[in-house]
């Protein structure tokens, strides 16, 4: 016997199921990333009030991605999405130097939550096409990622509008979640 329901479903249907929570400050590019992954194209977005949820299939893994609005009034609601989250995607607007401290604070607060203790962390350093964008190395420092203990994390430079870096991030996420 010894099969978990997840591995049984994988054997029957061939796809592993993963629950991913995608958060970040407002206007970081979360919804653009979600629909670029889902549809392969750029869609016109408006600020997300509440959430979007889509299934993204990639490399025999079925990711259920929850894209939760990032406005400051909505952020206290993020915690309602933490349960059973296996992977956390934190999207940062690499060009928004004025709010990087705010992004760091929100990320660090989230990572203290007990329900996310086992979730792996993928940071999308988005908007790398803009001339003033912070590099992944600079963001690693500003987000204090090197200070994280007992957490698997990875930062990926991305440009959601062009699709650059998104699948490289999913490759890392897939590999990490396959280890669990």
UniProtKB/Swiss-Prot annotation:
Question: Do you know which Gene3D superfamilies this protein is assigned to?
Answer: P-loop containing nucleotide triphosphate hydrolases (3.40.50.300)
Cited SUPFAM superfamilies: P-loop containing nucleoside triphosphate hydrolases
Domain of life (superkingdom): Eukaryota
Q: What is a biological process (GO) this protein takes part in?
A: symbiont entry into host cell
Where do we find N-myristoyl glycine lipid attachment? 2
* Keyword field: ER-Golgi transport, Golgi apparatus, GTP-binding, Lipoprotein, Myristate, Nucleotide-binding, Protein transport, Transport
Q: Which GO terms describe its molecular function?
A: enzyme activator activity; GTP binding; GTPase activity
- Where in the cell does this protein reside? Golgi apparatus
- Which is one Pfam family of this protein? Arf
Matches recorded under InterPro entries? Arf1-5-like, P-loop_NTPase, Small_GTP-bd, Small_GTPase_ARF, Small_GTPase_ARF/SAR
Would I find Iron-sulfur among this entry's keywords?
no
Q: Where does GTP bind?
A: 24-31, 67-71, 126-129
Tissue expression per record? Uniformly distributed throughout adults.
Q: Which family does it belong to?
A: Belongs to the small GTPase superfamily. Arf family.
Write down the NCBIfam families for this protein, in alphabetical order.
small_GTP
| Functional note | GTP-binding protein involved in protein trafficking; may modulate vesicle budding and uncoating within the Golgi apparatus.
Its recorded name reads ADP ribosylation factor 4
